[in-house]
Amino acid sequence: DFGHIQYVAAYR
């Protein structure tokens, strides 16, 4: 699941 990817994208 790449659902957390959006979180990382916004985090960086």
Curated annotation (Swiss-Prot):
Localization, UniProt: Membrane; Secreted; Cytoplasmic vesicle, Secretory vesicle, Acrosome membrane
Note the superkingdom of the native organism: Eukaryota
Query: Is the keyword Secreted in the record?
Result: yes
Kindly indicate whether the keyword Glycoprotein belongs to this entry. no
The processes (GO biological process) annotated in the record are: angiogenesis; cell adhesion; single fertilization
Q: Please tell me where this protein is predominantly located.
A: membrane
Could you list this entry's UniProt keywords, alphabetically sorted.
Angiogenesis, Cell adhesion, Cytoplasmic vesicle, Fertilization, Membrane, Secreted
Provide the topology term for how it sits in the membrane: Peripheral membrane protein
Identify one Gene Ontology CC term for this UniProt entry. extracellular region
Briefly state the protein's biological role. Answer: Specific ligand for the alpha-v/beta-3 and alpha-v/beta-5 receptors. Also binds to phosphatidylserine-enriched cell surfaces in a receptor-independent manner. Zona pellucida-binding protein which may play a role in gamete interaction. Contributes to phagocytic removal of apoptotic cells in many tissues. Plays an important role in the maintenance of intestinal epithelial homeostasis and the promotion of mucosal healing. Promotes VEGF-dependent neovascularization.
Give the protein name, as stated in the record. Answer: Lactadherin
Gene name of the encoded protein:
MFGE8
